[in-house]
Amino acid sequence: MAVEMFYDDDADLSIIQGRKVAVIGYGSQGHAHSLSLRDSGVQVKVGLKEGSKSREKAEEQGLEVDTPAEVAKWADVIMLLAPDTAQASIFTNDIEPNLEDGNALFFGHGLNIHFGLIKAPENVTVGMVAPKGPGHLVRRQFVDGKGVPCLIAIDQDPKGEGQALALSYAAAIGGARAGVIKTTFKEETETDLFGEQAVLCGGTEELIKTGFEVMVEAGYAPEMAYFEVLHELKLIVDLIYEGGIARMNYSVSDTAEFGGYLSGPRVIDADTKKRMQDILKDIQDGSFVKRLVANVEGGNKELEALRKANAEHPIEVTGKKLRDLMSWVDRPITETA
């Protein structure tokens, strides 16, 4: 099914310019949205809790900062860009008491709305504007006169103005320069979670660790295994990112290409596909989100245990030692990287 696309000519920037926008959060996406909205002539304030380390940075960049409750009270469009697991409490404590008829509540990801963790009043527009790139790229492209493609979706539209407002917002952060894709909260949420779990984070991580274990258990040096299954992955991913799988296969040696065709299906086979389908079902039926919420309510104990076990894997020890030799690699912000 073909997607519906919009560009700058389809967007009316004056719509968002006539509104007051509160951006809750000043992380990767929050800073990009806030600065680009401001540069597009939009009234914007940033909402941060008292004592936030991001407050000074936002103020240094010329933005007005107040508590989430105060900016929600001031604004008529509220973009909630805090972490997924913090959004429900922020909504309940700071946003919901300050919502008025005709306000709009926007998100950068659909999880909390799609799975019913946040339920906005019926007289509030609920929408999503989600750039398909990290915040630093969104901001850099905007400054360069370009843009990162965005997704927009409307879940609740009491006045019938939601799509025009979302499209205007997307244009204000540069998205309509590249292209805006219309989707739904369901589609964005479920595809995003599946991609993260089965391929980008979970799947790739386990593939790397298992490859490392197979080589080391066969008697190869951990350093050699690290280079072959982790370090060189960036070279392959960059080629795929730039031109797709065909570009990657064109660029590698015939030996690598031929071996990949023969062995890839032995690693990822019909049984793997079945398990991936099971992962998708767990996402669709809410099982994953229930476990996510239980983890948060339990003080993040399950996440911390998984994080600790992952950090202690031998590939992390080997990797840190080797990366210390690589002057061109940016130093990590975590103790284990």
From Swiss-Prot:
Mg(2+) 1 binds at residues 192, 196. Residues 184-329 form the KARI C-terminal knotted domain. Keywords: Amino-acid biosynthesis, Branched-chain amino acid biosynthesis, Magnesium, Metal-binding, NADP, Oxidoreductase. It catalyses: (2R)-2,3-dihydroxy-3-methylbutanoate + NADP(+) = (2S)-2-acetolactate + NADPH + H(+); (2R,3R)-2,3-dihydroxy-3-methylpentanoate + NADP(+) = (S)-2-ethyl-2-hydroxy-3-oxobutanoate + NADPH + H(+). Binds 2 magnesium ions per subunit. Substrate binds at residue 253. NADP(+) binds at residues 26-29, 49, 52, 54, 84-87, 135. It is an enzyme of class 1 (oxidoreductase). The active site is at residue 109. One of its GO terms (molecular function) is NADP binding. Its EC number is 1.1.1.86. GO terms for cellular component: cytosol. Mg(2+) 2 binds at residues 192, 228, 232. Signal peptide: none annotated. PROSITE patterns: KARI_C (PS51851), KARI_N (PS51850). It comes from the Bacteria. One of its GO terms (biological process) is L-valine biosynthetic process. Pathway: Amino-acid biosynthesis; L-isoleucine biosynthesis; L-isoleucine from 2-oxobutanoate: step 2/4; Amino-acid biosynthesis; L-valine biosynthesis; L-valine from pyruvate: step 2/4. Residues 3-183 form the KARI N-terminal Rossmann domain. Its cofactor is Mg(2+). Belongs to the ketol-acid reductoisomerase family. Involved in the biosynthesis of branched-chain amino acids (BCAA). Catalyzes an alkyl-migration followed by a ketol-acid reduction of (S)-2-acetolactate (S2AL) to yield (R)-2,3-dihydroxy-isovalerate. In the isomerase reaction, S2AL is rearranged via a Mg-dependent methyl migration to produce 3-hydroxy-3-methyl-2-ketobutyrate (HMKB). In the reductase reaction, this 2-ketoacid undergoes a metal-dependent reduction by NADPH to yield (R)-2,3-dihydroxy-isovalerate. This is Ketol-acid reductoisomerase (NADP(+)). The gene is ilvC.
